[in-house]
A protein has these predicted regions:
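Oxidizing extracytosolic/periplasmic lumen-facing domains
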Residues: 1-95
Length: 95
C-alpha cells in the first residue's frame, strides 16, 4: 500500500450509498424522462432529471423490487421525489 492510498477515501458500495441517501439525503422534486421495462412489463430502470440551484441534473437508477411493484408511479413524465447529497448534488436516488 502506498503512502497516498492510506489517506484516500474508500469507495462506497451501492447498498451503503442508497441507505445513506435514503436516511440523510435532502429531498427535491424530479421528473422521469425514460423507463426500461423487464420481460413482465414492470419498469425496472428509470432515467430522471432534477434541478438544484439552477443546475439541471440527469441520472438513472435500477428500481428496487418494491418500487417495481408500483410501476405506474415511475412512467415517463411522472413527477417523483428524489434524495440527494448536498455536498455532491449529482449523487441522488429515487424515493
Amino acid at each position: 500500500m502506498s503512502f497516498l492510498e492510506r489517506f484516500r477515501k474508500k469507495p462506497e458500495d451501492e447498498a451503503s450509498r442508497i441507505a445513506r441517501l435514503a436516511k440523510t439525503g435532502r429531498m427535491a422534486d424530479g421528473r422521469i424522462i425514460d423507463a426500461v421495462s423487464d420481460h413482465e412489463g414492470r419498469i425496472s430502470q428509470v432515467t430522471y432529471t432534477y434541478m438544484l440551484a439552477g443546475v439541471l441534473y440527469e441520472s438513472s437508477q435500477a428500481l428496487s423490487t418494491s418500487q417495481q411493484q408500483r410501476s405506474n408511479d415511475y412512467a415517463p413524465g411522472k413527477q417523483i421525489v428524489i434524495r440527494y447529497d448536498p455536498r455532491r448534488p449529482a449523487n441522488s436516488i429515487v424515493v
